[in-house]
C-alpha cells in the first residue's frame, strides 16, 4: 500500500509540472498505460491472499481514478490557457477602420462622354438618343450624302439589307430631332456607331458625339468659339487650336479641328461646319430663315489623347490592369 501511495503522490506532482498536452499524454502512458506503473501494481494481486485482494484492488482503483482525474483537470487547464493565449494573439482592435470593399470605377470612355455632356449641358444643349439600326434616309439621304458616296460601300458599312444598316454616325439622331422639333434647337447625340475597320486606331464599333445648333442668325464664329472653349475645358489646358478647311456632304463650309500636341505636332480631334441648306430642306426647315452648325467627335480618340493611350483597342479588351488606372 505504501508503494501505491508513493506512486500516486509522484504522479500528481509530475502532472502539476507538465507544461503541455504532449507531456500529459506521456504521463498517462507511463502510469495508466498497458505497461504503466498502476497496471504493474494490479499484477501484484496474484500474490495476495483472498482476504487481501478486495482491499488492494480497491486501493489500486482509487489510485487510478485519482491520477485520471488529475490528468483531466490539468488537460482542461492547459487547453483553457492555450485558448486564452490564442485569443489574445488574435485580438481585434475594434477601433481600427474596417476593410473597405473594392468598388468599380467608370470606364474611361464613359468618363469622356459624361465630361462632354456636362460641358454642353451648361450651354443649354440637351442629350438626344436614336436607333443604332438606321435606315438609309436618316443615315445617308437626309445628310446630303449622294448615292455613290464611298461611305455607302459594303466595305465601309454593315448592311442588313439595302435599306437597313448599323448606323455609321449619330447624325441620324439630328435628322430625327429636326423632323419632330422646331428651331431653335441645341442638341448633342452621344452613342455607338459602326464601321467596317479594325486596327490600332480603329474598331468596328466606337463611340461618337455629334452636336447640332439651329436658330436664326447662327454663324461660323459661334461654332469656333464654342469648340475652342470645349477643347480647352476638356483637356484642361490653354491649347493652341486651329480650324482647317475640309469637306463633309452635310456641312458647308466645313472644317477639321486640330490641337497642338505636347510633341509639337497638330492632332486632329473633330470635324465641324455650317449645316448644309439641303439638310435643312430634307427635314422641312427653311434655310432662308434658319441656319445652324454641326460638329462630331470620336469619343475614343479624345479619351486616348486625354489619358495618353496609344492603342484604341485597349478600351474594349476588359483588362482590369488597364481599366483600374482610371478609377
Swiss-Prot record:
Subcellular location as annotated: Cytoplasm
Binding site for Mg(2+): 252
Protein's UniProt keywords contain Transit peptide: no
Single Gene Ontology BP annotation: phenylalanyl-tRNA aminoacylation
Keyword Ribonucleoprotein annotated: no
Gene Ontology CC terms: cytoplasm
Names of the cofactor(s): Mg(2+)
EC class (word): ligase
Enzyme Commission number: 6.1.1.20
Molecular function via GO: ATP binding; magnesium ion binding; phenylalanine-tRNA ligase activity; tRNA binding
Reactions the enzyme catalyzes: tRNA(Phe) + L-phenylalanine + ATP = L-phenylalanyl-tRNA(Phe) + AMP + diphosphate + H(+)
Keywords, alphabetical: Aminoacyl-tRNA synthetase, ATP-binding, Cytoplasm, Ligase, Magnesium, Metal-binding, Nucleotide-binding, Protein biosynthesis
Gene3D superfamilies: Bira Bifunctional Protein, Domain 2 (3.30.930.10)
Record's cofactor remark: Binds 2 magnesium ions per tetramer.
Any coiled-coil regions, as ranges: none
UniProt-listed InterPro entries: aa-tRNA-synth_II (IPR006195), aa-tRNA-synth_II/BPL/LPL (IPR045864), Phe-tRNA-synth_IIc_asu (IPR004529), Phe-tRNA_ligase_II_N (IPR004188), Phe_tRNA_ligase_alpha1_bac (IPR022911), Phenylalanyl-tRNA_Synthase (IPR002319), tRNA-bd_arm (IPR010978)
Protein family membership: Belongs to the class-II aminoacyl-tRNA synthetase family. Phe-tRNA synthetase alpha subunit type 1 subfamily.
Record's subunit section: Tetramer of two alpha and two beta subunits.
NCBIfam families hit by this protein: pheS
Protein name: Phenylalanine--tRNA ligase alpha subunit
The organism of origin for this protein: Shewanella baltica (strain OS223)
Amino acid at each position: 500500500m505504501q508503494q501505491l501511495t508513493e506512486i500516486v503522490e509522484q504522479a500528481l506532482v509530475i502532472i502539476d509540472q507538465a507544461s503541455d498536452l504532449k507531456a500529459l499524454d506521456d504521463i498517462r502512458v507511463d502510469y495508466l498505460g498497458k505497461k504503466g506503473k498502476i497496471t504493474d501494481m494490479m499484477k501484484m494481486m496474484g500474490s495476495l491472499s483472498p482476504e487481501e485482494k478486495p482491499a488492494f484492488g480497491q486501493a489500486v482503483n482509487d489510485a487510478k481514478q485519482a491520477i485520471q482525474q488529475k490528468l483531466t483537470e490539468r488537460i482542461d487547464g492547459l487547453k483553457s490557457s492555450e485558448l486564452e493565449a490564442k485569443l489574445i494573439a488574435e485580438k481585434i482592435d475594434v477601433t481600427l477602420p474596417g476593410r473597405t470593399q473594392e468598388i468599380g470605377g467608370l470606364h474611361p470612355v464613359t468618363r469622356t462622354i459624361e465630361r462632354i455632356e456636362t460641358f454642353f449641358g451648361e450651354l443649354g444643349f440637351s442629350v438626344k438618343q436614336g436607333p443604332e439600326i438606321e435606315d438609309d434616309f436618316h443615315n445617308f439621304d437626309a445628310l446630303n450624302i449622294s448615292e455613290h458616296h464611298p461611305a455607302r460601300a459594303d466595305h465601309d458599312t454593315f448592311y442588313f439589307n439595302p435599306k437597313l444598316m448599323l448606323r455609321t454616325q449619330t447624325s441620324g439622331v439630328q435628322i430625327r430631332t429636326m423632323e419632330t422639333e422646331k428651331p431653335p434647337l441645341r442638341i448633342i447625340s452621344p452613342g455607338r456607331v459602326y464601321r467596317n475597320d479594325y486596327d490600332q486606331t480603329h474598331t468596328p464599333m466606337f463611340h461618337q458625339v455629334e452636336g447640332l445648333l439651329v436658330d436664326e442668325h447662327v454663324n461660323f464664329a459661334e461654332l469656333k468659339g464654342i469648340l475652342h472653349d470645349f477643347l480647352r475645358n476638356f483637356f484642361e489646358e490653354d491649347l493652341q487650336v486651329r480650324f482647317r478647311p475640309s469637306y463633309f456632304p452635310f456641312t458647308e463650309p466645313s472644317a477639321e479641328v486640330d490641337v497642338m500636341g505636347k510633341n509639337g505636332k497638330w492632332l486632329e480631334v473633330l470635324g465641324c461646319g455650317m449645316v448644309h441648306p439641303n439638310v435643312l430642306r430634307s427635314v422641312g426647315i427653311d434655310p432662308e430663315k434658319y441656319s445652324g452648325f454641326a460638329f462630331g467627335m470620336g469619343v475614343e480618340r479624345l479619351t486616348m489623347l486625354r489619358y495618353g493611350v496609344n492603342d484604341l483597342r485597349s478600351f474594349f479588351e476588359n483588362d482590369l490592369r488597364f481599366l483600374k488606372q482610371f478609377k
